[in-house]
């Protein structure tokens, strides 16, 4: 069973979504609820994946859905601090083609 660690903070008009733990089918519904609450007001968002240990297709589906929701509302969603292990999965699934990914949270905040 997965373990979700999720946080929300603001930095310079950008909302930073701390995405961590193990996001699998068991916790993907809770992850989706937390993401929907966080992005409800629209705006500029950075997904901080520095604490993300593992993510399955269910969690990736939530990320893609939230990116689409944010963009449809005129907002921006990028990701940052993705480990090499997770980046391999994102690359295999072409997520890196759908969402801009920055090496650090600071770089991502400046970019959005």
Summary of predicted features, one role per range:
Residues 2-33:
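STAS-typified acidic loop motif
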Residues 12, 50, 106:
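Conserved catalytic submotifs in the C-terminal HATPase_c
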Residues 25-98:
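Amphipathic alpha-helical interaction surfaces in cytosolic regulatory modules
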Residues 84, 106-107:
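Acidic phosphotransfer microenvironment of two-component signaling modules
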Residues 100-104:
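Short acidic-hydrophobic, aromatic-tinged amphipathic segments that line or gate anion-handling sites
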